[in-house]
Swiss-Prot record:
Its job: Responsible for synthesis of pseudouridine from uracil-516 in 16S ribosomal RNA.
Record-linked SUPFAM superfamilies: Alpha-L RNA-binding motif (SSF55174), Pseudouridine synthase (SSF55120)
Substrates-to-products reaction catalysed: uridine(516) in 16S rRNA = pseudouridine(516) in 16S rRNA
Matching InterPro entries: PsdUridine_s_RsuA/RluB/E/F_cat, PsdUridine_synth_cat_dom_sf, PsdUridine_synth_RsuA/RluA, PsdUridine_synth_RsuA/RluB/E/F, PsdUridine_synth_RsuA/RluB_CS, RsuA_PseudoU_synthase, S4_RNA-bd, S4_RNA-bd_sf
EC nos: 5.4.99.19
Family: Belongs to the pseudouridine synthase RsuA family.
Enzyme class: isomerase
Protein name: Ribosomal small subunit pseudouridine synthase A
GO biological process: enzyme-directed rRNA pseudouridine synthesis
GO cellular component, one term: cytosol
Domain S4 RNA-binding: 1-67
Higher taxonomy: Bacteria, Pseudomonadati, Pseudomonadota, Gammaproteobacteria, Vibrionales
Molecular function terms, GO-annotated: 16S rRNA pseudouridine(516) synthase activity; pseudouridine synthase activity; RNA binding
Amino acid sequence: MRLDKFLCDALGTTRKEATQLLKSGEVTVDDVVQKSGAFKLKETSCVEWQGREITLHGPRYIMMHKPDGVVCSHEDGFNQTALTLLDEVNIQDLHFAGRLDVDTTGLLLITDDGQWSHRVTSPKHKCEKTYRVWLADPIQADYAEQFNRGIELRGERELTLPAQLEVISETEVLLTIHEGKYHQVKRMFAALGNKVIGLHRERIGQITLDETLEPGEYRYLTEEEVASIWK
């Protein structure tokens, strides 16, 4: 394949834009700057743009440390969207595998693989999600038992699925749920007469938020992390 055709397909650029990228000297093939669009790539060629390898094949799986005040949508008239924090091409093709409220922080999964994200979010698969929760009032002695039995949410007839509560302090807990109802964690504690004042997602399935990521930073998932969702 010609190098300029590869850039058009991989980056979604026009042929003219690909030519301009090549002229900039920011494109390398196997660590050698290439400025000719006619350069023929081999199957083993490693193409980099601005020091980052670009490929044609394979969906994208991204872990982000979502900061406070950022919304999980493609467009928003008031708040910054999480997708604008990505330095990636064709971000319009990406979507969230489990959204977070604007005031909730932590692990956010982003992908363009619809089947994979469905596996994360579908109630049928009961994918575990662990949250660190800060409460306005001290927890009561029977909280863990009530969560394990299921909580009756306001406006719903069925109890939530059993959830696991780990007490960190009198106003801080880790809560693991197996479904994803609207504002579920906040509503569960509200049903017990308490109020969530801070919420941070730490884990989805076997994928745990990378401790090295600062709020707003992201990285691609490892092959093992991607595969874990199918287990």
